[in-house]
Amino acid sequence: MLNFFLITIQFLSGAVMYSHIIAKIKGIDLRKIRDGNPGSSNLWRAAGWKYGFPALMLDYFKGTFPIAFFVWNESFHVNRYVIAFAALSGILGHAFSPFLKFKGGKAIATTFGAWSVLTKWEGPMVLGTVFTIFSILHRLRGKNKTTPEEDAFRVMIGFAALLIYTMWKVFNGMPELAILYFGNFLIVFYKHRLELRRYLKGV
């Protein structure tokens, strides 16, 4: 019963679309911004960092709660595979929010949150390093902003690096990370599929 409760609550936590709520309060329709994604990146572009940054942090932290409580409080004795499925359910909730007719965000910030809890920030450091290198190279080419297609490519490169890290952890006593990784990859790939298709056509 506890396992089902944890997975369900984590899904509902991920499904709360803070960026959409903040945008509505500001009178902004995120569906008309850039790629129409109802996430923090588009809110940032539409309303600036004062609104985008808090939304980004909320998207991040909903990937950590409530699983962090169960991970750090060993008295609950929750199976680590259940924790992995719960972390994945939070990402799924953001990507396919029932509060937005199952049309959610790209789930990158929520992914960072989930991996922070299960890997003590190691997973997000892998993704963050790849994203930073990509941004530096992009600026060296004289570009200040990335397109949705370039963002999608960056995410896929980041997940390729995360796969290497995941396999290393799997073979060193954390096989449950394979569940989180492959489920997470499928969700993120699906959410970026159209941008990736356009990117590959333009290469």
From Swiss-Prot:
The enzyme's E.C. designation: 2.3.1.275
Biological process, per Gene Ontology: phospholipid biosynthetic process
Broadest EC class assigned to this enzyme: transferase
Compartment annotation: Cell inner membrane
Entry keywords, A to Z: Cell inner membrane, Cell membrane, Lipid biosynthesis, Lipid metabolism, Membrane, Phospholipid biosynthesis, Phospholipid metabolism, Transferase, Transmembrane, Transmembrane helix
Pathway it works in: Lipid metabolism; phospholipid metabolism
Entry's family note: Belongs to the PlsY family.
The name this protein goes by in its record: Glycerol-3-phosphate acyltransferase 1
UniProt organism field: Thermotoga maritima (strain ATCC 43589 / DSM 3109 / JCM 10099 / NBRC 100826 / MSB8)
Higher taxonomy: Bacteria, Thermotogati, Thermotogota, Thermotogae, Thermotogales
